[in-house]
Amino acid sequence: MFKIPGFGKAAANHTPPDMTNMDTRTRHLKVSNCPNNSYALANVAAVSPNDFPNNIYIIIDNLFVFTTRHSNDIPPGTIGFNGNQRTWGGWSLNQDVQAKAFDLFKYSGKQSYLGSIDIDISFRARGKAVSTVFDQDELAKQFVRCYESQIFSPTQYLIMEFQGHFFDLKIRNVQAIDLGDIEPTSAVATGIETKGILTKQTQINFFKGRDGLVNLKSSNSLRPRSNAVIRPDFKFEDLGVGGLDKEFTKIFRRAFASRIFPPSVIEKLGISHVKGLLLYGPPGTGKTLIARKIGTMLNAKEPKIVNGPEILSKYVGSSEENIRNLFKDAEAEYRAKGEESSLHIIIFDELDSVFKQRGSRGDGTGVGDNVVNQLLAKMDGVDQLNNILVIGMTNRKDLIDSALLRPGRFEVQVEIHLPDEKGRLQIFDIQTKKMRENNMMSDDVNLAELAALTKNFSGAEIEGLVKSASSFAINKTVNIGKGATKLNTKDIAKLKVTREDFLNALNDVTPAFGISEEDLKTCVEGGMMLYSERVNSILKNGARYVRQVRESDKSRLVSLLIHGPAGSGKTALAAEIALKSGFPFIRLISPNELSGMSESAKIAYIDNTFRDAYKSPLNILVIDSLETLVDWVPIGPRFSNNILQMLKVALKRKPPQDRRLLIMTTTSAYSVLQQMDILSCFDNEIAVPNMTNLDELNNVMIESNFLDDAGRVKVINELSRSCPNFNVGIKKTLTNIETARHDEDPVNELVELMTQSA
């Protein structure tokens, strides 16, 4: 609420008509015309001295209130109204009406004065319209001079003379207040039942009326806009959207703050309002929900919501026409009312599906380009509109035509990211509100614990988790047997969602931007074997790089190259480091997933994975077998230069300011990468050698629970004679051990297999 200048003073500074000891009996009167123009311009009811006292309030048909003025030209039993008054009441001449004295203070209590009044103004005769610009402050002074102390209600019609011109006025809305209050406590009302007395302190706002012909000069006062875009009773917590406090603050600052300021201030600043707001981010983070909720917090026209593909049509020119139709209402109102017109909101969902970069389509029709051109023309063309707000939503901001992202178009771009722990707690609080209010949630459920356990869950996934937990609780009351399914009615009364239900739901619902746990665990299927001090050293180095990415302010991106012979355990070590990191987002890019894809599909897959890695605060990417990803083969040799160049760029591209990324890349062809000139893309290198001494083999046999001590000693002794230059990878060693385990003579079988491998 805004403070209204002049209020907060004693109510004694205004004396209303004395209504004490007034005869309140109802009288039946006939409607007649007012005696002359002075009565018509004064907005009074002409009455006979025999019917009512002079200068009191009367109410007609228990709804319409006027101030009386005596006239000897009005016979007893009649009441004189001008044409505007008769239009407001819906009366015809000689019609019977009921009239009685009216005490506003008994009707409304202390809130009987007008804090503000909004008035539509039109020329009484269109043929006498002039292009003169009328000062709103002077109009307001004239209105007070003519009608001070009269009672006004929304929908009321009256006629006013100003500078020799006659105007029809219609009361749009009023705000009733108590003169003793510092600030208004009631909302702006548009219903006729709200009534108030006009005073010198009343804030009066004029707007172009139905003809749109009256040119109004912006008021020089610093009073706020009467048609403020933000509802006065709006609170952010009422939106029911959690985890987006910073985003809502930015949206309000950039898109709405200017719209609640007085037009005179905005005019002095020489700025225009923001017309476009782009919400982008991962799926399920609440972009569409925010757009819908923004419509509820605004005093605006009902938003027009359009899914991107709905714009397109098979008929020539229809797609462009669909765009024009979305702006038609806003254009018509802006022509009629100018800066005083209401805000029109247009919401585009899946913006990237239609407004792609011009020239990128291969259909040859040019329809997509024309649709982009049409939207650009409407948002920021020659005939600019200042009463629109276009809200676009997309998961792929990079696909949208760059011209749409410049100032004047979608200039406010807000990333709706995955919620942090505080945001997830807010979302859990919202999603379980009814559950808690109805005592359907067990006391052992700790929402803070659940928020900590649900790293990288989007708002939609948290909602799914709550539903899954509820299904586990419901399932306890249902007996599903061979016969009919039975519901235990006794258990329904005791139904509660417990901590165990939520923990079970965590296994049921996994985040889209979480850990590729299944793929990574496949890489270390047999567990991590610490057969050598070198393995311990590699894991410690990896943990150090993890800490660097997590804690250092200067290392948003760290790239590691893990190289060594094939089968030396590079992928397993990278997977182990990733799994032990505790990072919420871990992805594996493996040749297995890209097998069978075309070159362009591989590039798109790798690019999308890197982009996904920028959507979480802490991220790890494991790129397995880099030389295979670029399709390198020694015969020729040949490789995909497009994939190679894409990887070179991606490996060096730093994530956004508040995101961290650790990239671990494995290769068995170090010399090949050297020739490809990609080694400079990595910050550090970790060498993973084969097993080169028999003590390491002995440790592997012990951890694999293979043979007894005597058998292992025999294997080592045999290999020391047959393989003086022992050099075998851990992967091959484990395979040989499993093969020998199923032989009748495992000792000799393993010795033979290891000799062949060495």
From Swiss-Prot:
UniProt cross-references to Gene3D superfamilies, sorted A to Z: 1.10.8.60, 2.40.40.20, 3.10.330.10, P-loop containing nucleotide triphosphate hydrolases
Keywords, comma-separated and alphabetical: ATP-binding, Cytoplasm, ER-Golgi transport, Nucleotide-binding, Phosphoprotein, Protein transport, Repeat, Transport
Keyword Cytoplasm listed: yes
Binding site for ATP: 281-288, 564-571
Record-level GO cellular component terms: cytosol; Golgi apparatus; Golgi stack; mating projection tip
InterPro entries the UniProt entry points to: AAA+_ATPase, AAA_lid_3, Asp_de-COase-like_dom_sf, ATPase_AAA_core, ATPase_AAA_CS, Cdc48_dom2, CDC48_domain_2-like_sf, CDC4_N-term_subdom
Recorded GO MF terms: ATP binding; ATP hydrolysis activity; phosphatidic acid binding; SNARE binding
GO BP: autophagosome assembly; endoplasmic reticulum to Golgi vesicle-mediated transport; Golgi to plasma membrane protein transport; inter-Golgi cisterna vesicle-mediated transport; intra-Golgi vesicle-mediated transport; macroautophagy; SNARE complex disassembly; vacuole fusion, non-autophagic
Subcellular location: Cytoplasm
Subcellular location, principal: cytoplasm
Residue numbers carrying Phosphoserine: S226
Top-level taxon of the source organism: Eukaryota
Family membership: Belongs to the AAA ATPase family.
Other observations noted: Present with 5920 molecules/cell in log phase SD medium.
Record text on subunit structure and interactions: Homohexamer. Binds to SEC17.
Record function comment: Required for vesicle-mediated transport. Catalyzes the fusion of transport vesicles within the Golgi cisternae. Is also required for transport from the endoplasmic reticulum to the Golgi stack. Seems to function as a fusion protein required for the delivery of cargo proteins to all compartments of the Golgi stack independent of vesicle origin.
Protein name listed in UniProt: Vesicular-fusion protein SEC18
Organism: Saccharomyces cerevisiae (strain ATCC 204508 / S288c) (Baker's yeast)
Lineage of producing organism: Eukaryota, Fungi, Dikarya, Ascomycota, Saccharomycotina
